[in-house]
Design a protein with these regions (language model features):
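Catalytic core of membrane glycerolipid acyltransferases/transacylases, capturing the structured
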Residues: 19, 33-91, 99
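A secondary-structure boundary/capping signal
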Residues: 28, 44, 65-66, 83, ...
């Protein structure tokens, strides 16, 4: 299908052009092997984050993206071709969570930012427990990912990225919380996630 071709070409462009432009360094890529369902949980500092992570694995990412990105038709089509689907931020969007669960049940690799939107600085922002909830309900392990340099390369409000060095560190997969975990346990698990 056309979406697969668009995703493949975009992934090659990112790997060849953007990774070189940002002199991107990666460690821990071996934690992204296998064919089973997987949740990738990176910190979020820039609009570049999800794009730069796509070539880390040959598997196609699916991702939750803010609903406003889908309000302009050409951008909505491109985002969907890249595997994104909309989520209403700041609320428990049951429809998006249901779609994410179905994808994971089918063995997908799902990108979820535990901080929700982009944050500034080195401190971890307020964490949401969506990744923990999805992991608990589907049994998918969660891989924490650290990203440094994307905020300097393309801060909020900046339209064109600067050539700053970007470093990505992929941590080992963490087993999911217990399926029957209560909300407080999911929050505690989420706090531990990015501490890793």
């Amino acid at each position: 299908p056309v979406a697969s071709v668009v995703y493949g070409l975009t992934r090659v462009f990112i790997r060849v052009v953007l990774w070189s432009y940002f002199r991107l360094g990666v460690s821990g890529r071996e934690h992204l092997t296998g064919d089973a369902a997987l949740i990738i949980a990176p910190v979020h500092r820039s609009n570049l984050d999800s794009f730069l992570l796509a070539p880390l694995t040959r598997r196609r990412f699916r991702s939750l993206a803010k609903e406003s990105l889908f309000q302009v038709r050409p951008l909505a089509w491109f985002m969907a071709a890249l595997g994104a689907f909309p989520v209403r931020r700041g609320s428990a969007d049951r429809e998006s969570l249901r779609a994410a669960r179905l994808l994971l049940d089918e063995g997908a690799t799902l990108l979820v930012f535990p901080e929700g939107g982009r944050q500034q600085g080195d401190e971890i922002g307020e964490l949401f427990d969506g990744a923990a909830y999805l992991a608990a309900r589907t049994g998918a392990p969660v891989v924490p990912v650290g990203i440094a340099g994307t905020e300097e390369a393309m801060a909020q409000g900046v339209r064109l990225p600067r050539p700053c060095r970007v470093q990505v560190v992929v941590g080992p997969a963490l087993p999911p919380p217990d399926r029957s975990a209560k909300r407080s346990a999911l929050r505690a698990w989420t706090a531990d996630l990015l501490a890793n």
